[in-house]
Amino acid sequence: MQTQVLFEHPLNEKMRTWLRIEFLIQQLTVNLPIADHAGALHFFRNVSELLDVFERGEVRTELLKELDRQQRKLQTWIGVPGVDQSRIEALIQQLKAAGSVLISAPRIGQFLREDRLIALVRQRLSIPGGCCSFDLPSLHIWLHLPQAQRDSQVETWIASLNPLTQALTMVLDLIRQSAPFRKQTSLNGFYQDNGGDADLLRLNLSLDSQLYPQISGHKSRFAIRFMPLDSENGQVPERLDFELACC
């Protein structure tokens, strides 16, 4: 069986921001528990980048709008024959609950911004080698605390993002499930189509081809060019089958 690689590409700025936030939150938990300097720097660097993303836009406002939009979409299915009504109603209630929690939560990321250790590490991350023990003795001593004490603090930091994480997970799940994958074929490594007001492109490509997509465009129209991973010797077939979902 062929191994399929999933590529996702945002077609607007809000989706680009959401995918970056999702990626960074996932990265926070990859190397847990934090047991050494490398794991700590990975964690704090992702926290810092996450706070940078939060400062660039109205993340909460856009998410609340999307939660409301998804509720309205689901309400159009109420009463439609053959549709699982209990599932629809449960999703609507979950969206409402996520919105209520998000709107009543403190400013997104504020708890992390106000943490002294996070602030000290953030100041040094842009300096090459700036997180040595003599630059950050506070981080050095923190790494020598009992593991359980560090774990508890990390859990508290991550938990402060729960209102955002829960709302974002629901929104992205619904968007990803909003359109099925359909087989498409590129000619000479190129494919273009209308986006149909989509927010996100999802593309499944066989690993055997050792190709990757370069995607450009916006919600009304997009283009995909397939490129060989080996830029010198790799080849792009005249016809290439792949699966595409416009969500």
Swiss-Prot record:
Gene Ontology annotations for the cellular component aspect, listed alphabetically: cell division site; cytoplasm
Subcellular localization: Cytoplasm
Main function: Cell division factor that enhances FtsZ-ring assembly. Directly interacts with FtsZ and promotes bundling of FtsZ protofilaments, with a reduction in FtsZ GTPase activity.
Record-linked HAMAP family: ZapD (MF_01092)
Lineage: Bacteria, Pseudomonadati, Pseudomonadota, Gammaproteobacteria, Enterobacterales
Family the entry assigns: Belongs to the ZapD family.
Cell cycle recorded as keyword: yes
Subunit: Interacts with FtsZ.
Keywords: Cell cycle, Cell division, Cytoplasm, Septation
Record carries keyword Cell division: yes
The species this protein was found in: Escherichia coli O17:K52:H18 (strain UMN026 / ExPEC)
Name of the gene: zapD
GO BP field: division septum assembly; FtsZ-dependent cytokinesis
Name the record gives this protein: Cell division protein ZapD
PANTHER family to which the protein is assigned, alphabetical: CELL DIVISION PROTEIN ZAPD
InterPro entries, per database record: ZapD (IPR009777), ZapD_C (IPR027462), ZapD_sf (IPR036268)
